[in-house]
Structure formats: structure tokens, C-alpha cells
């Protein structure tokens, strides 16, 4: 037998979830976090309706401080009716990391109600005690009074509104909260950013000046001041402010991130690199931090270092087409330095030219016959990843087009992407309400988990049905019931309220 004839093909074969779970546990023992993440993803894909692989994946994502991604996995598991009491404990850990403390308490109470003698019962009790301990929360989160908690909750919601592009709503919310807590620096700093991002720079400057004149400014206030100086082309004042910020020994991720952005925007890449390396010790799996680190290395002509950042991002999320783009750019420039781009997008998104090219590619696909579209959806991984990427764009028209296309496909993958859309705080409520109807028409199992109107909720479409149409104000009450009472608590609360409202409507005998 010759050497040639002895060569054979390596035939891949699917492994069980148990196999990948064992490999993932072994990686964790070796402290190979990204290796374990990969194994647990494979385990979850092999058995998506089993609780153990999903919870293992959610747990490691929580460890990596990717709390929202972890929560989406747990909530989708619960929506499929295969969740376990441990899901509530996992949600509590994530809500705590997301600074959603009321939801953390609610989830812990749900866990203890569903499994009072469960494996995490003692931990849940201790967790609740910590959340009720003013001194502990002051040390951990900088919160002491009820006003502090209210301000924190308002800032969390305002950031979600800003991520969704609704700056006016964020401003309105924060102005209202500032009336109740006029001395809150946290609220004023967030209001500054809401004004700035909404194009009202004069009002943003007014808030910053008020804080600085009163001596209540903090490091985030000074970051905002430097940002406003840059926006007004006052480079000398901005540089002086940034020099002052560099003397800070803060370990606050939010403050360090603000300083890093300013340094990148002013082309001070070496200084930015130092700040980002400090940040990496605190949030080593944060995509925005890794992207800025990659960009700084790229600008400093450390192309292999830049590539390592995007390779790391792709190990975290193999479907991340933004990381794929920047990895490709780094490789091209490494091979030929003359092709070095003068500027990338500091925000974690592809540049406009690349976004335009991708959207043109999607539009060409939309012109294909439906059968060809379905074929691409089924077999073209790149096409699927492009659609997922397009939903991250701020343009509402793009979102509507992609959501309509997913609705057309009506399969398990489309349903999963629609459910995922509902759970993303940065996505607009109007489109989420449309997705509720799409899922209902597709026959997707209820309840539908969502972040809607600033609340995490689980709801059922048409959970109140009548044989006759209701006037708009009465119909709106149903939506309010869903949004205001449909949180993660026991569904019986919503059912009881719905029953009361139904009896009231029926008592009117259609005389509205």
C-alpha cells in the first residue's frame, strides 16, 4: 500500500451535547474561557431545548460580563416552556450586573417561590440581604438612598432609549427625574449626553457648566466638557481637559471608556492604548473596548496586534460580521501598508461605505424570486449573518425590511431571530410591537419575552379577546396591562387583572 493510498478523508460527525458539555467543563478547569464558550455554544446548538446546555452557556456569558446576551438565552429558554427554577437565579445575577436591581430582587423572589429548597436557595437569600443592605450597595454600586436607586433606574432606561435612537424621550425622562432629584450628578451627566446625542449641544453645555460652577462635577462631567470642546472645535481647551483626565487614577469602566473615546477622537493613540489596556483588565470581553484597542493598534501600525483583537471578538461571537470586516482590513494592511485606511468608525460598526455595500447586496437578494431567497436563507450562512447585522443599524426602514423578510421565511431560525429582536433594549418599541403580531401569525409558542416600554416582560398576544372591536382607548388599556403588569413575575397577576378588565368590558354591553 502506497502512502497516497493510505491517505483518507477525515469525516466530521456530530457530537452530543453531553460530549461538548464535558469538553467545556474541562476548558473551564484550565481557565480557557473562550474555549469553554465555544464548547458550550456547540452543546446548546446540539440540544437547544434542554436546559442544562443553555444555562451553562448563559453562565459563562454572565461570567464574561455579557449580561444581556446571557439573559436573552435564558428568557428564550423560558419562552419555550423548558426553563427550570435556576433560570430565575441566572436572570437575577445578570440583572444585578446590568444595574437593574428591582428585576434582580424580583427574579430572586421568583426563584425562592419556585424552588425554596433548591441548590441556590441559600445564595438567593444572601443575595436578597445584600440588595437590602444600604452600606453594601453603597460600596458596590455607589447607591444609598431611594433617590439614588430611582436615578440609577432612570439612567439605565435613558441609555436604552438613546441606544434605540429616541433621544427626545431620553431627555424628557431625565428632565422629569432631575426635578425630583436636582442634586443628582448621575442624572445630570446622563442628561448632558442625551442632549448632545440629540443635537442640542447648547443645552448640553448648560448642564455641564451648571455642574462645574457648583463644584459638583465628577470625572464623567469633565469627559463631557472635553467632548463639547471638541464639538466646538476648541482643541486647545479639549486637550487641556483630557490632560487633566489622564492624571486620574479612576478604575470606573464608564469613566475609563469616556477617556479612551476622547483620546481616540483626538488621535492620541498611545495614550488611548494605555487606558484601554487598563480597561481590558476590568472588561476583557467587551466588544467596544476590544474594537477601540484594535483600532489604536492599527493606527500605531501594530497590525498583528489589531488582528488579535478581532480574532478574539470572533471567538466570542463567530457570527460577528463587524469583527470579520475589521480583521480583513487589518490583514490587508499588514500585507501592504500603503492600503492603510485613514480612519475607521470608533463606534462598533462598519464604516459607511461598507454598510452601503452590504445593504446593496441585501437589496439585490430581495429582488430574487421567493424560492431563491428561501434557498439563500437556508444554505448561505453569509446571507443570514448579513441580515442579522442589518438589524443593528439605526435606520428604521432597514429594520422593517429585514423583519418582513424574516416573517416571510417563517421557520425556526426566523422565529429565533424575531424573538431575539424583542429582547434587545436598543431596538425600537414600535418595531417590537409589530414583531409580536408576526410571531402570533407564525404560530410561535407564547409567551413572548420582550423589553418594551422600559420593562422586561413576558406577554401573550390577544390574551384578552372579544367578539367585537373595542374603541381605541379601551384597546389601549390592554396594551398597558401587558406592558405595566407583564414583567417576570407570576403570570397569574396579569391573568387576574385581565379577568377584572374583561368583566368590566362585558358589563358595558358594547355601550362605550
Q: Model-found features: residue ranges?
A:
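Alpha-helical segment of the N-proximal tetratricopeptide repeat
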Residues: 15-46, 63, 146-180, 190, ...
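Canonical tetratricopeptide repeat
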Residues: 22, 56, 90, 123-127, ...
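Register position in tetratricopeptide repeats
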Residues: 29, 63, 97, 127-130, ...
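Short coil turns that delineate tetratricopeptide repeat
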Residues: 48, 82, 116, 182, ...
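TPR alpha-solenoid repeat register
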Residues: 53, 87, 121-124, 153, ...
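TPR/TPR-like (Sel1-like) alpha-helical repeat modules
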Residues: 96-133, 247-251, 281, 303-339, ...
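Amphipathic alpha-helical scaffolding segments comprising HEAT/armadillo-like alpha-solenoid repeats
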Residues: 307, 380-392, 411-423, 444-453
Amino acid at each position: 500500500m502506497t502512502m497516497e493510498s493510505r491517505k483518507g478523508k477525515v469525516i466530521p460527525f456530530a457530537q452530543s451535547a453531553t460530549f461538548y458539555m464535558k469538553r467545556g467543563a474541562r476548558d473551564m478547569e484550565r481557565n480557557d474561557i473562550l474555549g469553554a464558550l465555544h464548547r458550550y455554544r456547540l452543546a446548546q446548538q446540539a440540544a437547544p431545548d434542554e436546559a442544562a446546555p443553555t444555562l451553562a452557556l448563559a453562565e459563562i456569558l454572565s461570567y464574561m460580563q455579557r449580561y444581556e446576551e446571557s439573559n436573552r438565552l435564558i428568557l428564550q429558554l423560558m419562552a419555550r416552556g423548558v426553563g427550570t427554577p435556576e433560570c430565575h437565579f441566572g436572570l437575577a445575577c445578570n440583572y444585578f450586573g446590568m444595574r437593574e436591581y428591582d428585576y434582580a430582587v424580583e427574579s430572586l423572589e421568583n426563584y425562592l417561590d419556585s424552588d425554596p429548597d433548591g441548590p441556590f436557595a441559600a445564595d438567593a437569600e444572601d443575595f436578597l440581604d445584600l440588595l437590602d443592605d444600604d452600606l453594601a450597595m453603597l460600596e458596590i454600586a455607589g447607591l444609598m438612598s431611594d433617590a439614588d436607586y430611582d436615578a440609577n433606574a432612570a439612567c439605565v432606561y435613558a441609555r436604552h432609549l438613546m441606544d434605540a435612537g429616541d433621544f427626545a424621550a431620553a431627555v424628557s425622562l431625565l428632565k422629569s427625574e432631575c426635578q425630583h432629584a436636582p442634586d443628582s450628578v448621575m442624572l445630570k451627566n446622563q442628561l448632558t449626553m442625551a442632549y448632545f446625542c440629540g443635537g442640542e449641544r447648547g443645552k448640553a453645555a448648560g448642564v455641564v457648566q451648571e455642574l462645574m460652577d457648583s463644584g459638583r462635577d465628577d470625572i464623567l462631567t469633565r469627559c463631557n466638557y472635553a467632548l463639547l470642546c471638541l464639538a466646538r472645535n476648541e482643541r486647545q481647551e479639549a486637550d487641556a481637559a483630557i490632560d487633566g483626565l489622564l492624571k486620574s487614577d479612576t478604575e470606573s469602566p464608564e469613566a475609563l471608556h469616556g477617556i479612551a473615546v476622547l483620546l481616540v477622537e483626538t488621535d492620541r493613540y498611545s495614550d488611548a492604548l494605555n487606558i484601554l489596556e487598563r480597561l481590558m483588565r476590568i472588561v476583557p470581553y467587551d466588544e467596544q473596548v476590544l474594537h477601540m484597542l484594535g483600532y489604536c493598534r492599527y493606527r500605531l501600525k501594530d497590525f498583528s496586534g489589531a488582528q488579535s483583537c478581532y480574532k478574539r471578538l470572533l471567538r466570542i461571537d463567530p457570527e460577528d460580521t463587524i469583527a470579520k470586516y475589521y480583521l480583513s482590513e487589518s490583514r490587508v494592511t499588514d500585507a501592504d501598508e500603503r492600503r492603510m485606511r485613514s480612519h475607521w468608525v470608533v463606534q462598533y460598526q462598519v464604516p459607511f461605505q461598507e454598510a452601503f455595500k452590504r445593504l446593496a447586496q441585501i437589496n439585490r437578494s430581495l429582488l430574487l424570486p421567493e424560492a431563491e431567497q428561501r434557498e439563500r436563507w437556508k444554505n448561505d450562512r453569509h446571507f443570514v449573518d448579513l441580515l442579522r447585522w442589518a438589524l443593528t443599524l439605526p435606520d428604521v426602514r432597514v429594520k422593517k425590511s429585514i423583519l418582513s423578510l424574516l416573517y416571510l421565511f417563517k421557520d425556526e431560525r426566523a422565529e429565533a431571530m424575531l424573538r431575539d429582536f424583542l429582547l434587545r433594549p436598543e431596538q425600537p418599541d414600535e418595531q417590537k410591537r409589530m414583531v409580536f403580531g408576526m410571531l402570533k401569525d407564525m404560530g410561535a409558542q407564547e409567551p413572548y419575552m420582550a423589553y418594551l416600554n422600559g420593562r422586561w416582560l413576558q406577554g401573550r398576544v390577544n390574551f384578552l379577546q372579544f367578539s367585537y372591536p373595542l374603541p381605541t382607548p379601551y384597546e389601549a388599556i390592554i396594551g398597558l396591562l401587558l406592558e405595566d403588569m407583564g414583567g417576570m413575575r407570576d403570570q397569574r397577576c396579569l391573568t387576574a387583572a385581565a379577568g377584572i378588565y374583561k368583566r368590566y368590558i362585558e358589563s358595558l354591553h358594547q355601550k362605550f
